[in-house]
Amino acid sequence: MAGVRLGVSYKFLTVTVGSLFLLAACSEEAPQTTQVMESEAPMAAPVEPGLGINPRGKTELEIDMSRIHNPQIAEVFDYIDTNIDSHVENLQRWIQQPSVSNTGEGIQESAYMVEGFFDQLGCQETEVVDPGITEYGSQANPVVYAICDEGAEKTMAVYWMYDTMPITQPDLWLSPPFEARIVEQPPFDKVIIGRGANNSKGRQMSFWNAMMSIKAVAGSLPVNLIFLAEGDEERMSIGYRKFIRDNPDLFTEADVMWGGGSSEGSVFVELISSGEQWGRGPTYSNIHGGRKRQVDAPAWRHIKMLATLVDDTGNRVMIDGFYDDIVPLTEAEEAILMEAAEDFDVEVAAERLGVARFISDDPYEVQKMSRYGQSMNLDGIWAGNMFEGGSGAILPNRIVSKHNFRYVPNQTGPDIVNKLRAHLDKHGYEDVEINVVGDVPWAKMDDDNELSMAIREMRETFGAGNPEPIYEETILGGYWPAYLFAGDVYDIPIADGYVGGGGGAHAANEYFIIEGAGNTYGMAGMEKSIATAIYEYAGLNEEE
């Protein structure tokens, strides 16, 4: 497969993360990086066990080996089991490297760490690229591009995000969020707690470990890979969007994409009130809070403004026309939600999520809200004295609130922003500024492709069950920049699939399951499931 060279590389950067050492340069040809995780020699002796990980854990599910027709896959399974300690250590090192896109903490170092992963995998071309200034006026974070030409018949594009959310409640963590400590969390004997463990470093490292295991056993991968990793997913993929649109030839040779499937829409805005724009209250800076007796408060007015945007429950958006363009669910989508609701325990799900209860107690309604709901959230608000406890009289001159709108077909982000502007003007808030942080449109897709069918085969093999395939386009998926690959720039079949996982994304004590239990596989199971899906897609698990 032919390579695509990109435009801008970063200068020399040396990164030390735990036992990880990488060196990257600005030359056209990416330098070889120091081997840091697994031996170069195929089937080399594994590292001495240090963690005592049980690959199977207490998982009650069984892999149906009668469906594994290629003996090479069984060898890969054995390799994963033998090396699971080092695979978990790989994930720990990855979590220990902060990569917080909204603050910039560790972003540059993380980009080069990702490039090191791709170099380690044997990709012939790897590059860290600066997309430049985005359409929203912000500097993009680096993207990392790699081509792994295995001489295979099929080529798979692979989506990665290397950024995470910030740590917003450090006191609630059971262990430091960048320590990647292994702890017991019933029913699981071993999970890793850390920022990014579930979203999405655990899955990414499982994919990487699986590919490294295949290479160690077989010497090459069943498919060619084109990686493109972004550092802006938690910033609405603003840099990724620019980079993909600026480089429309990147994935022309890709047959499919390993990614998250369909996607809801999401637009983020900030609403900004100030005494200067209002013409009342403090104008230049905060003033003494005692002056409230004689001076208007922009902050109180902002709170009153927010109250006009939703109903008394906070669950229905009151912006005129907000719901006008929504397309009703199809019969196929209704059936999917009904099936998902059959085995859905509302109370258990709420407890695992860390909420007292859902808006509805009906399993079907909760599934529908989760996968086809619309909302306006208050993500954060700040002004004045933001120190918990104590005192300190402040009358703020400026207040900012951050909001995300989740939307579905045929709503659009720009239309929602326009309707928001009209609502504010109608209610006398012409001075309130709207700052659009970013917009990720929804994306529809179906299961009618070879990768989706391969994933279905894998799930049957792993006893994970399968919903009926969807042969009409839907958006029953969470937010990610799928739209870029579903008609905006490319039109590629997209799917991914694995067993195992974690929880607590964006929350304190985010975790990834290392040793499974009950009907849940651990990390070894996830790696095996990914390897199996890749072999199935490549047509290398056919029954003779």
Where are these regions (language model features)?
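Bacterial signal peptide processing site
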Residues: 27-29
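An extended, acidic, His-containing surface patch that forms the Zn2+-binding/catalytic region
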Residues: 318-398, 406-422, 427, 431-544
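Bacterial N-terminal signal peptides that target proteins for export
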Residues: 1-14
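A non-catalytic alpha/beta surface segment that caps or lines the substrate-entry region
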Residues: 90, 100-154, 179
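N-terminal hydrophobic or amphipathic helices/low-complexity stretches enriched
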Residues: 31-106, 124
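Active-site metal-coordination/substrate-binding segment of hydrolases
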Residues: 153-226, 519
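Fold-level recognition of mixed alpha/beta catalytic cores in primary-metabolism enzymes, strongest
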Residues: 196-361, 367-374, 506, 511-523
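C-terminal motif of bacterial Sec signal peptides marking the signal peptidase cleavage site
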Residues: 23-25
